[in-house]
Amino acid sequence: MKRYVLAAGLALAVITVLGLVGQQKARSDDPDGNVVSEYANNGHGVRVIWGQHTVVDGSHIATWALVDPHDGTILAAGATFSLELAEEMPDPGDGPDGAIASLEFPDVVQEATFLYHIEIQSNPQGHEAPPGSVNPDRNRVPHFDFHFYSIPEELVWLIPAQAPPLPKVAADYLPAGYTQPGPSIVEMGRHAAPQWSLTDPDPLTAVMLAGFLPDGSRMHFLEPMISQDVLLSRQDFALDVPMPKLFGREMLYPTQFRTVFHGNACSLVFSDFVNVK
């Protein structure tokens, strides 16, 4: 029974977080979401812990975690933004590889889970598809790259561009159903894609990529890549989370990802964390 109660509280709290960020433009005097934290804490069985917050072209963006107030269990972690971001498709920013925002997660998330910070890249013109794609223009649609990194931003700045041949990722470290990653992109790393995406003739809608360090030693980001059209459709959806057999360290790792909409806000939610060794 507790599982279902927590699930209901989690869903309600996510909606509450969404409502806050969707209203932030009119409530810039409350950037930390104290009202929402109190609402979730006192009335709905979950506690909201806020990470960092910024404003990009009028769109408020915040990171957060939802935890069980009784035992501190991390129920979900994510980022929420108002949909002005998708409507405007900002030009590249001054973050790594042109990121328009780079926000750390709360300490409790950084200390215990795979997630350390998020970087958001806006691609109004799209970009090339991975080598071997049957549709080389698949990713040449307006979209966002949401990089959920397991390492600090200062280490992302140090990642070099490197062309193949590069070391293969060991089988136990490569998620099942994913391709070997390609070249290393400067200030980002190497991208591995679901094998099905290379044979998909249709334009990009949404896909979950896995990122690897240049030497292929370990996975260091999860990347939901989502088109502008999908975001503006305001329809909730889920993506499978890549699950390697080995990670190289012990931590909590998310097994579920969903995108949830509420009014003029969108939330990218990782949940159902499991302990990996």
PLM-predicted stretches and their roles:
Residues 3, 7-33:
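Bacterial Sec-dependent N-terminal signal peptides
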Residues 26-277:
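Metal-centered catalytic cores of metalloenzymes
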